[in-house]
Amino acid sequence: MPHSCRLFRFTGFILFMTLAINAFADEPPTVRVKGKGKGQDKTFVADRETFHFLLTNHKAISRTVKKLDRGVETVTESDNPEVAKKIQEHVPAMYERLKSGNGVRYWDPLFAETFKHGKKMKMEISNTEKGVKVTETSDDAEVVRIIQAHAKVVSKFVEKGFEEAHKEHPLPTKGETK
């Protein structure tokens, strides 16, 4: 057999073994498939676990949204003390992500845009006995539409839990009213 054929077969064997070893490796591949974000930071896992806890317990959560000229006022609460505590953890954690630009759910167009404009948003958070009251505003009309659309989606998370969280959410159109 000519040397080039043996080299070709040997290269093929090495390629096959490399793929086979990777296919059966204990650790998942490090390639990011879905997300477009900056990757995990030191608080990502804790934030995700809190979000998943809230989605799992969505039926124990109540939420009201009041549209304002420059944003929204929301009250998100639960009669369950454990759920109320998680709401009080989740909201300021997400505000920190807004301010830092280190968002989550970049695969979801609305969330990507929300975090893109996070520095143009002002948020006042106050704990209630059973959760949080938030006033979120902006001086930018486009950002106000994003804030209001985000509030609607969060209300859908409360209503439907994981069913809604697995969906992508479109950006509000410029013609949408406040």
Segments (PLM) and residue ranges:
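Bacterial N-terminal signal peptides that target proteins for export
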Residues: P2-G12
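Bacterial N-terminal signal peptides
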Residues: T11-N22
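A low-complexity, Ser/Thr/Gly/Pro-enriched, surface-exposed linker/loop concept
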Residues: E27-H58, E82-K119, V154, V158-P172
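Terminal, regulation- and interaction-focused segments at domain boundaries
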Residues: E27-V33, K66-E82, K130-G131, T135
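Primarily extracytoplasmic ectodomains and periplasmic/lumenal surface modules that are beta-strand-rich
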Residues: G71-V72, D79-K85, A93-Y95, D140-V144
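Short, solvent-exposed interaction modules
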Residues: P109-D139
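Short, well-ordered, aromatic-rich surface patches in folded extracellular/luminal domains
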Residues: N127-E164
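Short, solvent-exposed mixed-charge patches
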Residues: E176-K178
